[in-house]
Design a protein with these regions (language model features):
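N-terminal Rossmann NAD(P)H-binding glycine-rich loop of SDR-like oxidoreductase domains
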Residues: 1-22
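Conserved Rossmann-fold NAD(P)-dependent oxidoreductase catalytic core, especially the SDR/UDP-sugar
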Residues: 83-121, 138
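NAD(P)H-binding glycine-rich loop region in Rossmannoid oxidoreductase-like domains
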Residues: 37-80, 88-90
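NAD(P)-dependent short-chain dehydrogenase/reductase
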Residues: 137-196, 203
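Rossmann-fold cofactor-recognition segment
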Residues: 29-39
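Glycine-rich Rossmann NAD(P)(H)-binding loop
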Residues: 187-196, 221-228, 278
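C-terminal amphipathic/interface module of NAD(P)-dependent oxidoreductases
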Residues: 247-248, 261-304
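Mid/C-terminal beta-alpha module of Rossmann-like enzyme folds, strongest
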Residues: 206-260, 294-304
Length: 304
């Protein structure tokens, strides 16, 4: 399978590339220097040249504070780019998979199923929800793959410092880095943060997306873990799996500037039962997921 993967140099994209290549796929990595995804002609040309079986769109403009300040660029970077890629997929006959997020929900609905109506509360969630509509309404062969609470290594920059943020990304890695250094780690507690989610190892999400590609599965999928957790529970489970000192954990307010404009949805738990049935697979449990993350962090090798 030949996959045109946007955002391959990013956190999520680097994990997808690792999984796809491990499964035998040829991954085409368009760099921003080579193609501006907001440039329709450039996208159509590079996709036509690549002749992919599938387009997996994971690239984002991740300067979240800027999304409300430069709304035109934000729209073009998310919705415009997705539209161009959907048109390119239609022209080439490829399936397009949009990597989306649990932040398309407002955080009040409890575990959200794949068909739960979206209701984002911040610019990032809105732009992703709008991009989902492009794929579901415009693409002849479209798939939305929502991921959630993503943990893992950045395979392009595996030794880069990790920090806690308003979402769950890098949470476990940041905690492990601190506690292994003998430093205290404050688990943030604030209703404006994403506090409950479905922790997911990025490579596990990649395996689910690969399974969807193999089965030519369309529609909206929840490519996530099989257990929910809040920040403190995830911290305690990680301490146990990584054999760290729980006495170094604190609970307190977030750092100044950590809350994004509009806040983050408080409870973004996903119900992925329909996805598991469609893909005929079991969803990974949290302890096993953390064990694989530990192996990846300690060996810098893909673990399964």
């Amino acid at each position: 399978m030949r996959i045109y993967l946007t955002g391959a140099s990013g956190f999520v994209g680097s994990n997808l590339a690792r999984v796809f290549e491990a499964r035998g796929a040829e991954v085409v990595r368009p760099a921003h220097a080579d193609v501006d995804l907001a440039d329709r002609d450039a996208v159509l040309r590079t996709v036509a040249d690549a002749r992919p079986d599938a387009i997996v769109h994971s690239a984002i403009w991740n300067a979240f504070a800027e999304l409300t300040r430069d709304r035109r660029r934000a729209w073009d970077s998310y919705v415009g780019a997705t539209r161009h890629l959907a048109d390119a997929a239609n022209g080439s006959g490829a399936r397009i998979v949009l990597i989306s997020t649990d932040w398309v929900f407002d955080g009040t609905q409890g575990p959200a199923a794949e068909d739960e109506p979206t209701n984002p509360i911040n610019a990032y969630g809105f732009l992703k929800a709008a991009s989902e509509l492009v794929v579901t309404e415009r693409a002849a062969r479209g798939t939305v793959a929502r991921i959630a609470g993503v943990q893992g290594l950045h395979w392009e920059r595996p030794d880069a410092p990790r920090t806690q943020d308003a979402g769950f990304g890098y949470f476990v890695a940041a905690l492990v880095d601190a506690l292994r250094a003998g430093e205290r780690f404050t688990v943030w507690d604030d209703p404006r943060l994403n506090t409950r989610a479905t922790p997911t190892l990025a490579t596990d999400a990649g395996e689910l997306i690969w399974r969807a590609l193999e089965r030519d599965a369309g529609g909206i999928l929840h490519c996530c873990g099989g257990e929910h957790a809040d920040r403190l529970e995830l911290a305690r489970r990680a301490v146990d799996v990584f054999e760290l000192d729980e006495e170094l954990l604190d609970v307190g307010p977030p750092d100044a500037g950590a809350v994004p404009p509009g806040g983050a949805p408080f409870d973004t738990r996903l119900d992925a039962a329909a996805t598991a049935r469609l893909l005929d697979t079991a969803l990974p449990d949290l302890t096993a997921m953390l064990g694989r993350l530990r192996a990846q962090m300690e060996t810098h090798c893909l673990s399964t």
